[in-house]
Amino acid sequence: MQKRELYEIADGKLVRKHRFCPRCGPGVFLAEHADRYSCGRCGYTEFKKAKKSKS
């Protein structure tokens, strides 16, 4: 994936589609997986919250 694919223009402003890594700082994005976000540079991982189903 190229860096230009991680941004979009909305209402004349540049908007990031992904989040930055809190350890590495701006410019290093977190990859989005089905159950987690992970940094390919430092290995930082955040797990997504599981949605509770109504029963």
Swiss-Prot record:
| Named cofactor requirement(s) | Zn(2+)
Cofactor binding mode, per the note? Answer: Binds 1 zinc ion per subunit.
Which controlled-vocabulary keywords does the entry list? Metal-binding, Ribonucleoprotein, Ribosomal protein, Zinc, Zinc-finger
Q: Which domain of life is it from?
A: Archaea
Q: Which GO terms describe its molecular function?
A: structural constituent of ribosome; zinc ion binding
Q: Where are the transmembrane segments?
A: none
InterPro entries (UniProt xref): Ribosomal_eS31, Ribosomal_eS31_arc, Ribosomal_zn-bd
Q: One short Pfam family name for this protein?
A: Ribosomal_S27
Which amino acid positions bind Zn(2+), per UniProt?
C21, C24, C39, C42
Please provide the Gene Ontology terms (biological process) for this protein: translation
* Family per similarity comment: Belongs to the eukaryotic ribosomal protein eS31 family.
Q: What does the record note on quaternary structure?
A: Part of the 30S ribosomal subunit.
Q: What is this protein called?
A: Small ribosomal subunit protein eS31
Q: Which organism is it from?
A: Thermoplasma acidophilum (strain ATCC 25905 / DSM 1728 / JCM 9062 / NBRC 15155 / AMRC-C165)
